Amino acid sequence: MKFSSVSEEKPGLLAPPAQPLTKMFQGAWLCWASLLLLVRVTQPCPVGCDCFDRKIFCSDEQLAAIPLDIPSHVTDIVFVETSFTTVGTRAFSGSPNLTKVVFLNTRVHHLEPDAFGGLPRLEDLEVTGSPFSNLSANIFSNLSSLGKLTLDFNRLAALPEDLFHHMDTLESLQLQGNQLQTLPGRLFQSLRYLRTLNLAQNLLTQLPKGMFQSLSSLQILKLSDNMFARLPEGVLSNLGSLQELFLDSNAITELSPHLFSHLLSLEKLWLQHNAISLLPVSAFSSLRNLTFLNLKDNALRTLPAGLFTHNPGLLHLSLSYNQLETVPEGSFANLRKLASLTLSHNAITHLPENVFRNLEQLVKLSLDSNNLTVLHPTLFHNLSKLQLLDLSRNQLTMLPGGIFDTNYDLFNLALLGNPWQCDCRLSYLTSWLRLYNDRIFNTHTFCAGPAYLKGQLVPNLKQEQLVCPGNPGQLGLDDREPAGSWDLAVEGRAAHRQCIYGNPEGTVLLACEEAQCRWLNIQLSSREGSDVTAMAYNSSQEWELRSTCGSVRVTVSIEAQAAGP
Amino acid sequence: MPDLPSAFLPLLLLSKFVTPVTFRHHRYDDLVRTLYKVHNQCPDITRLYNIGRSVKGRYLYVLEFSDYPGTHEPLEPEVKYVGNMHGNEVLGRELLLQLSEFLCEEFRNRNQRILRLIQDTRIHILPSMNPDGYEVAAAQGPNTSGYLVGRNNANGVDLNRNFPDLNTYFYYNSKYGGPNHHLPLPDNWKSQVEPETRAVIQWIRSLNFVLSANMHGGAVVANYPYDKSLEHRFRSPHRTSNSPTPDDELFQTLAKVYSYAHGWMHQGWNCGDYFPDGITNGASWYSLSKGMQDFNYLHTNCFEITLELSCNKFPRQEELQREWLGNREALIQFLEQVHQGIKGMVLDENYNNLTGAVISVTGINHDVTSGEHGDYFRLLLPGTYSVTAKASGYEPKTVTVTVGPAGPTLVDFQLKRSTTQVHPVQKAPGRGQGSRAKQPRTSRKKDQAAKRHRGPA
């Protein structure tokens, strides 16, 4: 009886607990799913901002504070021309996933001491175009992952020495366009992995000697647009990895002989727009990897012999806008890879015959705006790859025959602004232009003389216009064989001898062969309106023209015909 | 080289001694940062402004270069470059960012050619008209084979098929009489176009642009108007034909300026296609309606060409430097062309500026109008022309002008108030061009009134 009672009771107890448990589980699951959906759906974009996946752009000029409701999944936030003026302590601590924070031309002028605290993953921080002028020493102290810091175009006048002391991972530091006058000597001491340092457009006049001594990884250093008159010896001595150095637009008057002596990796050196008047011969002797050198707009009067001896890899060299009067013969002897050489806007009066001899890879040569009067016939020989040659704005009256004979690729030759004398000595040039150069490039190249050709376009000249009075037009030799010789060859040559008769002013020219005359050129009055009067109607004029063949008399008359059909 | 105007004189290649720029692709945030950097670096000659927003809300930023940025100086022409109209065609975007950095850097280096250009020209650079499409293309990565991914805007619309179609109206007017310039917009145009198109239209109506280029990819050729074939409606859509504008010779010259200054465009053989001189009439290549370059010509004073710049629409980062070196001289020379032709002031007897005066050139069936400051600009090739200025209520004036190779030629007009009391006669359009009814615009207000009466085109 007891056994039967116990058995009956047990099944009854098992049923009720199972059912409520199942119901509770289902309810919990539904509740969880609803919460998930709600969270996702209700992630709002902060007012005044635009959201693109994990990036936020806040461009509302009325945005008066950093939003407190930045979604937590956001990695990039950019503020453009917003109006809040302060970044408060730990302003972004609710967004621990941020890797990029950018302020562009905002009104921020105050960064609280721990403004960027709570951003362990921040890699890229930029505050640019803002009116803030100072930073507290520990403002960046918690940014352990930062690789790129940009503080361009603010009003920073001074930087605390410890500012970058905990930024071990920094690779790029941009401080361009501030008002820095001096820098503490140990400012960059901790930046062992820095690759790019930009201090351009500040007011720096000097650098402490040890300024860059920790920057052994530095590849690009920009010091352009400051007020350096000199750099201390040794300031660059630890920059063995440096590839590009910008010193342009300063007030540098001289370079110490060993300033660059440790820059063994340097490829590009920008020294333009300074006041360098003298270069020590060893200035570039350690720069064996140099490919670009810009010395434009300095005050160089001479180049020391051997200046570029140790730069065999140089590809582009500019010496324009200096005061060079000539270039020593061996200056470029070792620059066998040079592709571009600019010597324009100097005071060069002559060039040694072999100065360009070894520049076999030269493509572009600029000699414009100098005082060249005569060029040696072999000056451009060996320049078989030359494509562009600028001789404009010099004092050239002619070019020697054969000067371009080995310049097979020359298609762009600039000649304007020279006082070309368009007589027989220009025959080579005009023939060459007709064959090899597109006349469109010389549409402003005019003759300066002789008087009757002044103002004529050089490329449009005909060969027979290029004559020298008193000389045979075709042959360069007087034929001295006695007349009456039985030698047919001599007789044939004599029969084709041409004489050019001319008057002293060069206004009347007559081309004749032995038995007849072929053309007559008369300039009745000078283009300059000189005192020579033009011929009137119904008048005649007579000239006696001379050449080495003798003299002839030419009479020209002009008769006005009665009007008729 | 074929015969080309003497404007090629400054063909000496720009020096390679320029500060190197970073050659990389720019996503939207990098584009904004780069533009702000250029503006901050050259604050006295630049202005950064936006003309509107894309579908997704990205700003269409424009960087202006001028010696007085933000101000139109009378007789100083406005020019524009537009890039990245198709989001996946990205070289134009990168070139325009490089050009911005280059102009700033060369200005600071006191490059005389660039100094003169910035002093005499007001340059507007819109690196990306389709920033949403760009992000779609960039997300694919430059090596994927998706040919059209990112071409359209976020609404799936091809922006170079989205402008009001004024070609049909012009072709009709050429035949039966009617305006040959500043064709009106339909009343409901704003509801017909995408936000990016609307922003650009409002932009080009707000400034009196004279010259323009918009940049694409997929070919290497300089394309000039018309894009829409004159014969399209009457022949098989598969046949294309040359469809010249009244300024065909001028447009060919503008296109040749770019192609011959380019490193290799002029060779003609590019991307497996051949275009003589590296140029093509748009319609003779293939016809397209509602394009931006035709709209510029038909609705405004602006002469626009379309530059196809690279075979690969989204070139690899490593190719960008070569592309920049190949395009740099062309980008500068093309801007310099805005100084060809004639320009001047249109004034009344009391030396007040006349806005909306019509400048006609005999033999060219396309007029231009004077701007809000009374100045006008008419691009012309070297030659001798008969030029007439007309304004409502004033006696027309005609002068003979010789345009030289170095321009522009200054030609001012002073118009006397008309003393004739003839009432305007309402004529039905007659046959032939001689009876064309010109509608000079003396003020925007009057133009609005005229548009309301006329109704949709």
UniProtKB/Swiss-Prot annotation, chain B:
Reactions listed under catalytic activity: Release of a C-terminal basic amino acid, preferentially lysine
Query: CDD domains annotated for this entry?
Result: Peptidase_M14NE-CP-C_like
| Catalytic residues identified in the record | E308 (proton donor/acceptor)
Q: Does the keyword Thylakoid apply?
A: no
Subcellular localization? Secreted, Extracellular space
Q: Which residues are glycosylated?
A: T400, T402, T409
**Has UniProt tagged this entry with the keyword Disulfide bond?**
yes
Region Disordered, as annotated, extends over 418-457
Q: Which GO terms describe its biological process?
A: bradykinin catabolic process; peptide metabolic process; protein catabolic process; protein processing; response to glucocorticoid
What is the disulfide pattern of this chain? Answer: C42-C104, C271-C311
Which EC number applies?
A: 3.4.17.3
Q: Where is the Peptidase M14 domain?
A: 24-338
Q: Which GO terms describe its cellular component?
A: extracellular space
Name the positions where Zn(2+) binds.
H86, E89, H216
User: What Pfam families does the database record attribute to this sequence?
Assistant: CarboxypepD_reg, Peptidase_M14
What does the UniProt cofactor note say?
A: Binds 1 zinc ion per subunit.
Tell me the cofactors it needs. Zn(2+)
Q: Which UniProt keywords apply?
A: Carboxypeptidase, Disulfide bond, Glycoprotein, Hydrolase, Metal-binding, Metalloprotease, Protease, Secreted, Signal, Zinc
State the family it belongs to.
Answer: Belongs to the peptidase M14 family.
> How the protein assembles, per its UniProt entry?
Tetramer of two catalytic chains and two glycosylated inactive chains.
Q: What does this protein do?
A: Protects the body from potent vasoactive and inflammatory peptides containing C-terminal Arg or Lys (such as kinins or anaphylatoxins) which are released into the circulation.
Identification of the protein by name: Carboxypeptidase N catalytic chain
